[in-house]
Amino acid sequence: MRISKPHLRSVSIQCYLCLLLNSHFLTEAGIHVFILGCFSAGLPKTEANWVNVISDLKKIEDLIQSMHIDATLYTESDVHPSCKVTAMKCFLLELQVISHESGDTDIHDTVENLIILANNILSSNGNITESGCKECEELEEKNIKEFLQSFVHIVQMFINAS
């Protein structure tokens, strides 16, 4: 019975060994290439996607249900499609306020994970410059529940665009 690991790159260690032994790289450099190849075969692919971001947002929403956090956050409730990256960056900045105000380690860890995921996705799309968009401080202040609902809405805009 063969156990499959879907997140591992399909790199055969035997191929590296064969290439190493049958080539002129029988030097220290060749051994380094072989060792690095072995390590890379075991590394999981880290492809973040917006579905994971929504999952983390739902988790944050569930975690704050039992707390009373009286914070208002800059919230973009009517995002224009040409300003969605700017709005997303504002949401990510405001998310750190939730992490700080809650003082909860689960919320902190989930927020950190969400920020890393979203930033990875945004950076993989390249540097997009948007003009004519509102600054974070110009946005309306809303409670956490409305903030999270608007956040989910903007993430869905990214999902629908891809």
UniProtKB/Swiss-Prot annotation:
The keyword Transcription does not apply. SUPFAM superfamilies: 4-helical cytokines. Keywords: Cytokine, Disulfide bond, Glycoprotein, Secreted, Signal. GO terms for cellular component: extracellular space. GO terms for molecular function: cytokine activity; cytokine receptor binding. It comes from the Eukaryota. Residues 1-29 form the signal peptide. GO terms for biological process: immune response; interleukin-15-mediated signaling pathway; neutrophil activation; positive regulation of cytokine production; positive regulation of immune response; positive regulation of peptidyl-tyrosine phosphorylation; positive regulation of phagocytosis; positive regulation of T cell proliferation. Gene3D superfamilies: Interleukin-15/Interleukin-21. It is found in: Secreted. It comes from Macaca thibetana (Pere David's macaque). The keyword Disulfide bond applies. Disulfide bonds join C83-C133, C90-C136. Belongs to the IL-15/IL-21 family. Cytokine that plays a major role in the development of inflammatory and protective immune responses to microbial invaders and parasites by modulating immune cells of both the innate and adaptive immune systems. Stimulates the proliferation of natural killer cells, T-cells and B-cells and promotes the secretion of several cytokines. In monocytes, induces the production of IL8 and monocyte chemotactic protein 1/CCL2, two chemokines that attract neutrophils and monocytes respectively to sites of infection. InterPro entries: 4_helix_cytokine-like_core, IL-15, IL-15/IL-21_fam, IL-15_mml. Residues 30-48 form a propeptide. Glycans are attached at N127. PANTHER family: INTERLEUKIN-15 (PTHR14356:SF3), INTERLEUKIN-15-RELATED (PTHR14356). This is Interleukin-15. The lineage of its organism: Eukaryota, Metazoa, Chordata, Craniata, Vertebrata.
